[in-house]
Swiss-Prot record:
Signal peptide: none annotated. The BC-like-box motif mediates the interaction with elongin BC complex. It comes from Human immunodeficiency virus type 1 group M subtype J (isolate SE9173). Residues 14-17, 74-79 are annotated as: Interaction with host APOBEC3F. Residues 54-72 are annotated as: Interaction with host APOBEC3F and APOBEC3G. It comes from the Viruses. This is Virion infectivity factor. Residues 151-164 are annotated as: Multimerization. It is found in: Host cytoplasm; Host cell membrane; Virion. The modification Phosphothreonine is found at residues 96, 188. Residues 159-192 are annotated as: Disordered. The modification Phosphoserine is found at residues 144, 165. Counteracts the innate antiviral activity of host APOBEC3F and APOBEC3G by promoting their ubiquitination and degradation. Acts as a substrate recognition component of an E3 ubiquitin-protein ligase complex: mechanistically, Vif hijacks a host cullin-5-RING E3 ubiquitin-protein ligase complex (ECS complex) and the transcription coactivator CBFB/CBF-beta to form an active E3 ubiquitin-protein ligase complex that targets APOBEC3G and APOBEC3F for polyubiquitination, leading to their degradation by the proteasome. A motif (HCCH motif) lies at residues 108-139.
Length: 192
């Protein structure tokens, strides 16, 4: 019988970022209770030796599974030390991998309500509109006209600690292009 390979997208992430993600998930599961329905599985609960942890996030009938890995092949950069994250959407027997932006939007859509329909009526009547979005990571694209109008009225309050964002977990801080200065800002080009 021949070998069968299954390819998965694993985002390479540094160890400290994975530790921050895990501690934020545990904080919001146990202390703030905003993620009390989430399930955290430790490495010893898994039979796979490379799995560091799993976070199961229920989304109605489906669920999002964020799996962190350790002991992977090291990458070409110094900070690629064999740590990684995969994000999977599961519903019954169907599974597909999703990117971090979509994962954050799915979490936001299911768990966090930015503004209720009555907030528009209150804003038009000049009354105080109090709902705020606790999960800003779910807003990676331009929102609806309703959302944009209400965010102009209300500045979102920053939460400490922030809710765990999948996109922040896999963000590549090291390979971002360098910002270059133009001729007015550059000290070496104008001789000063």
């Amino acid at each position: 019988m021949e070998n069968r390979w299954q390819v998965m997208i694993v985002w390479q992430v540094d160890r400290m970022r994975i530790n921050t993600w895990k501690s934020l998930v545990k904080y919001h599961m146990n202390v703030s209770k905003k993620a009390r329905q989430w399930l955290y599985r430790h490495h010893y609960d898994s039979r796979h030796p490379k799995i560091s942890s799993e976070v199961h996030i229920p989304l109605g009938e489906a669920r999002l599974v964020v799996t962190t890995y350790w002991g992977l092949q090291t990458g070409e950069r110094d900070w690629h030390l064999g740590q990684g994250v995969s994000i999977e959407w599961r519903r019954k027997r169907y599974r597909t991998q999703v990117d971090p932006g979509l994962a954050d939007q799915l979490i936001h859509m299911h768990y966090f309500d930015c503004f209720s329909d009555s907030a528009i009526r209150k804003a038009i009547l000049g009354q105080i509109v109090s709902p705020r979005c606790d999960y800003q990571a779910g807003h990676n694209k331009v929102g609806s006209l309703q959302y944009l109008a209400l965010t102009a009225l209300i500045k979102p309050k920053r939460r400490k600690p922030p809710l765990p964002s999948v996109q922040k977990l896999v963000e590549d801080r090291w390979n971002k292009p360098q910002k270059t200065r133009d001729h007015r800002e550059s000290h070496t080009m104008n001789g000063h």
